[in-house]
A protein has these predicted regions:
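Glycine-centered, phosphate/nucleic-acid-interacting loop/turn motifs that mediate DNA/RNA or nucleotide
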Residues: 61
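Short beta-strand "wing" residues that participate in macromolecule-binding interfaces
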Residues: 65
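Conserved catalytic-core motifs of eukaryotic protein kinase domains, centered on the activation segment
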Residues: 69
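Amphipathic alpha-helical dimerization/coiled-coil segments
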Residues: 87-110
Length: 110
């Protein structure tokens, strides 16, 4: 693994997927690309991690999917947030902010 890439911390994948879908529906490759883009290449989500997570999140009713056509005219499954998914995004965002503050405090402790 290149040195500029980091393994996803446990629990962050859901947050990143939900955030990627917050503005618009996307297919799997679009979600992966968006996460890589917004994290400036720090997180690269491989299909073996992404698609099981999408399936699990759809089972939890955080996402719904429908078949459509991708930008290169291929059939693709598009995912979008549900109301429950938006609530989950808020919850996960709040939790991550609390964790970030706590870790920053720990790193600055002498």
């Amino acid at each position: 693994m290149p040195s500029n890439q980091t393994n996803l911390l446990q629990g962050t994948l859901d947050l990143l997927i939900l955030k990627a879908l917050a503005l618009e529906e996307m297919h799997g490759l679009g979600i992966s690309r968006r996460i890589e883009q917004v994290t400036r290449g720090t997180f690269v989500v491989k299909p073996g991690s992404l698609f099981p997570a999408l399936h699990r999140m759809e089972e939890a009713s955080w996402l719904v999917s429908s078949w459509g056509e991708s930008e290169n005219n291929r059939r693709a499954k598009f995912y979008r947030l549900t109301a429950a998914g938006r609530r989950r995004l808020e919850t996960e965002t709040d939790q991550w902010r609390r964790i970030s503050v706590a870790i920053a405090a720990a790193l600055e402790a002498t």
